[in-house]
Amino acid sequence: SSPHLVQVRERIRINGQPISKDLFSKYFWLVYNRLEKTRDPAHASMPAYFRFLTIMAFHVFLQEKVDLAVVEVGIGGTYDCTNIIRSPVVCGVSSLGIDHTSILGDTMEKIAWQKGGIFKPGVPAFTVAQPERPLEVLRERAQELKCPLYLCPELDDFEEGCRALELGLAGAHQRSNAALALQLARMWLQRRGCQGVGELKEVPPGTELLGRPVPLAPPFQLTDAMIQGLRDTEWLGRTQVLCHGPVTWYLDGAHTTSSIQACVRWFRQAALNQDKPHDGSEVRVLLFNATGDRDTAALLKLLVPCHFDYAVFCPNFTEVSVTNNADQQNFNVTLENSLTRCLENQRTWTRLLEEKVGQDPWLPSPLRAGGLLQPAPTRGSLLLVPPAPRPLNSPALVFPCLAQALRWVAQGRDPQLAAPAASGAHPHPAASSGAVLLREAAAVRVLVTGSLHLVGGVLRLLDPALSQ
């Protein structure tokens, strides 16, 4: 799977656990040296990062003699380097969203065409409820590639006559993921000749059922192992809650409009479920970053209704200086470029709040908090300085790295984080006034969302054991 959150070993798992450091090192050098020896002089470059890890993953699975390999596509499907398996047991397409538009296209239909490229002749494929036209594109791709395509039944259909299924992953959107997982698992068990899961009888492509152009796969009787699997599933960085004293961290990597909408629904419900402080003093903080060609304005607009007291923007770097932690390094971007993107996000947040106030005169003005920082050109380092006074600031702050951002948010109240320096790199008055509120609040609720790399950096700082 990809991306990893803390350590690259997370991408290659056996029996649910990342392979050990020794095993990773062993197979890394074995694959690297073999590629080096067989390199074609006409094509001297080694495979890129993701492609190399894909080759390595296949080699690990073959050498370790796994019974089943679950392979997640990197980007799209048709032209992805994972799409070299000629006869998989089954294929699955989860809920579609707009992402990686420069590679996959800027419409759901174009993206659906790319996703459908993983379909194989005679190999059953499943998908979940999709918008009408993208679903039609998937059906057309299935017919083109002679692949029997089925629509997963709703999870509710599995619950008839039994108690409601409990999912380990929170959020309503996880129900469709669970329904897809059940169908994929059933096909594997059916291939193995396991009894008690029912047999999926192939429906001719194009058959309509309940007005749908894609046939609906029937629900089946779930085994105890399936029910337990759904209940015990964990996936770091997705709808994850960490309670550290008065500071509660809500982590959910989401970088498309549909995933941000799901994140907002989950966060609002999760915050409601938490015990309310007796004196009512609660501070809500957003920690956000997005990378690539994503429309951050569209993403941030969806987060405004959460009524955050502060919005914090920072790059995905855990520290300002380059560390020796290769798992967290991205050599394709610089701190300066990343920080410029954060400043753009902050200005967007300011504009969105001002528009919100303009639309509703009863809303309080965002004058009471703010702090816009701009990079000052220096030699060898990056400094942050406050700009000239502006008539209207936003309740937003920009930090140069995650460590500084998290220390400011926690204000020494999270045992995993050191207290912020008395004279830090954030001299704006809003940082000082916000620090007082954060220190005195009975509860601090922090939503960390956007880039999965951001979530991974936060996890590394909040749970050092993940780096071991």
Identify the meaning behind each predicted range.
Residues 2-86, 102-106, 132-135:
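ATP-dependent carboxylate-amine ligase catalytic core
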Residues 44-45, 125-128, 250-251, 285-287:
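Short catalytic-loop micro-motif centered on adjacent basic/acidic residues
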Residues 56-62, 182-190, 460:
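Short glycine/serine- and small hydrophobic-enriched flexible loop segments
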Residues 68-71, 81-92, 96-97, 162-310:
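Nucleotide phosphate-binding/pyrophosphate-handling subdomain across enzymes
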Residues 74-147, 265-266, 287, 291-300:
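Conserved catalytic-core segment of NTP-binding enzymes
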Residues 86-87, 244-248, 255-468:
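ATP-dependent carboxylate-amine ligase
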Residues 148-152, 240, 250, 397:
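General small-molecule cofactor/ligand-binding pocket signal
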Residues 153-159, 317:
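Beta-strand-loop-alpha "switch" segments that mediate conformational coupling across diverse proteins
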